[in-house]
């Protein structure tokens, strides 16, 4: 045995133990069942892959649906939160509105009570006015009947005068014709006829003048009858009538503002000239305790009390009470209340009584 032979690897030598035996791997490949098993395994892998793909796709769809559902929930939460805020705001607004409405109700209730009181006063004034209008209506009807009788009489006289004038005109015409026929007659006859013509002409002129006067009287009476038909009474609407004066209760304003209002209505603040006037006014305001300015004032303490027209106060009818000794820049002004006359600062607010002369029907 050479050195090279000794150096050969031991595995080059045949394995005695493996002689006569086939390898196990080769034995499996040579088995008739390995191909169907492999195909089955491949199919299972494909099915599993497809299933995984489908499941993954469905999972993505479910994930998208969950995201959309989450977004919808978020949106609904925002909407719900907005609704809750709006409801809270509405409740707060409702509370404020309730408070505001309650305040308005209280104010309206107070105004309603004031209006009810004013309505009672207006009802009394309306009753007094209706009585005054009834008296004026009775007076107006009598005046109209009287005027109608006068107009009928004048119209009848006018017709008579017109008839007389026509007769005179006819006589003049006849005389002129006779004068024309007698133009060739004697001068004496002409003078006689001319004298008669002059006399008749003079009478005609007198009758014409009387007729014009009657026409003017007729026109004046017709105008008076028209005024009587339109005459609603000696006092304007809402004014009270007492003897020769009309009275209006209005306000409330300061003394100066009431004075200006009375002047704009053609009158002045109340001036009491007699006990009868004072009794009427006190009776007219006996249903209320409100103060009423009258046209009596003075500039400074110690100076005389003067009416609006400058005449001094006659203490025979009444005296002022509760006169303040304090000096006001606007002076002291008098007012009626509870049947007495008081004096106070002229800038205070009170009702007033306007006064003006009655407007009698002129015939």
Swiss-Prot record:
Under the heading InterPro entries, the entry gives:
C-type_lectin-like (IPR001304), C-type_lectin-like/link_sf (IPR016186), CTDL_fold (IPR016187), NKR-like_CTLD (IPR033992), OxLDL_rcpt1-like (IPR052332)
Q: Where are the sequence repeats?
A: 96-141, 142-187, 188-233
Provide the membrane topology annotation.
Lipid-anchor; Single-pass type II membrane protein
Recorded superkingdom: Eukaryota
Q: Where are the transmembrane segments?
A: 32-54
Q: Region labeled Disordered — which residues? A: 1-22
Mind telling me which SUPFAM superfamilies this protein's record contains?
C-type lectin-like
Q: Where in the cell is it found?
A: Cell membrane; Membrane raft; Secreted
* Residues of the C-type lectin domain: 242-355
* Swiss-Prot/TrEMBL GO biological process terms: cell adhesion; immune system process; inflammatory response
Please report which positions carry a covalently bound lipid of kind S-palmitoyl cysteine: 45
Write out the entry's keywords from A to Z: Cell adhesion, Cell membrane, Coiled coil, Disulfide bond, Glycoprotein, Immunity, Inflammatory response, Lectin, Lipoprotein, Membrane, Palmitate, Receptor, Repeat, Secreted, Signal-anchor, Transmembrane, Transmembrane helix
Provide the record's note on post-translational modification.
N-glycosylated.
| GO cellular component terms, semicolon-separated | extracellular region; extrinsic component of plasma membrane; membrane raft; receptor complex
General function of this protein? Receptor that mediates the recognition, internalization and degradation of oxidatively modified low density lipoprotein (oxLDL) by vascular endothelial cells. OxLDL is a marker of atherosclerosis that induces vascular endothelial cell activation and dysfunction, resulting in pro-inflammatory responses, pro-oxidative conditions and apoptosis.
Name by which UniProt lists this protein? Oxidized low-density lipoprotein receptor 1
